[in-house]
Amino acid sequence: MDDGKKKSDPKLEQAFSCSTRYIDELLTINNDGLMKTYMSEIYPEELELKHENKDDDQHTTYLDLNIDVVNQELVTSLYDKRDDFPFKIVNFPDLSGNIPNAGSYGVFIAQTLRYARACAKYTDFIERTLILKHQLVKQICNETILIKKLVRWIQGSIKGKIMNKYGHDMTKIMSDLITMSQTNPLYDKHVEYA
């Protein structure tokens, strides 16, 4: 699309103002489907792009995010395309191997921070964290140590303050991470069993 066409049509310019591309992934949510119309004018045909938007442009996946427009607000949650695979994925440290324990438990904190940054809703954060916790426990991590490290991180790290966005105190978060995992076997669905 030439710049003259965009400048002559302010509505068209506005529709593309929040569009972005990272390598082969396009983000054009809430674009009224215009990207599909103009994509061949914007990008060369040799460039194969992934445009993951649903038909109504109110939902898309981009990199590792699900993005939905709900009541005129963007609601994000974590998207991992490996969840869609018809087989189990084995990842993250397995303490039965010859690797240091401290770094392995650090993976839990790093992933929890990533989940908190990506998930707008508390329930999405808890669900992802429970899946990870179960996977790490199956890979010989100690559940009590995981929880203690999480508490220490949330209370002692400036990055742990991100948890404040959910409006729950430490007692509620820990309660949900312990009791929900005991009452809902669905959190084992992504875990590879030995």
Model-derived features with residue positions:
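Charged structural interfaces that engage phosphate-rich ligands
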Residues: 1-194
